[in-house]
């Protein structure tokens, strides 16, 4: 088992990042740059990860792909596509996002609409579309469980996996989020 933390810590170079992770005893890490980084910078981080035996556990999206504002929603979806492509290119274990919110302005907020039948259907439909469009080969796309949006626990996660029915969809089992 590899242990890690969910932050890249403050650093100025890929080498400093990798050394800090190693010093903490981390062997699983979140990727510290996103799809807007240059190919050279991404390669530098990957080289340092390899030198220090760091597994890229996840590439985060952390955007509301169901935002009420159409412009914000499309920007979030484009970012999700680009992040999933990046995660696949670097061989991350997963590319993760929360389901998103359906009832208000806070991207990860708790709203009653988050538990509607429509929210479930939209989540399943969107996830299928994202996977089918990007067609990742090396990474699993996953949804972070949260107590105030789907999935909230193992039963919903299993149902979500069944309904999405894509080999490229994986389970991001964050049990702390299920109980907090």
Language model feature labels by segment:
Residues 1-4, 57-66, 101-110:
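N-terminal small/glycine-rich loop or linker at the start of catalytic domains
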Residues 2-7, 29-31, 56-61, 95-97, ...:
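Hydrophobic faces of well-ordered beta-strands that scaffold small-molecule active sites
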Residues 3, 20-27:
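A short, Lys/Arg-enriched amphipathic alpha-helix followed by its capping loop at the start of a domain
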Residues 7-15, 31-43, 65-71, 103, ...:
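Acidic-and-aromatic substrate-binding clefts and catalytic sites of carbohydrate-active enzymes
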Residues 8-23, 54:
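Short, composition-biased local secondary-structure segments
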Residues 15, 19, 51, 70-171:
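Active-site acidic/histidine proton-transfer and metal-coordination neighborhood
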Residues 27-28, 45:
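Accessory recognition modules or surfaces
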Residues 39-53, 58:
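Aromatic-lined substrate-binding rim segments of carbohydrate-active enzymes
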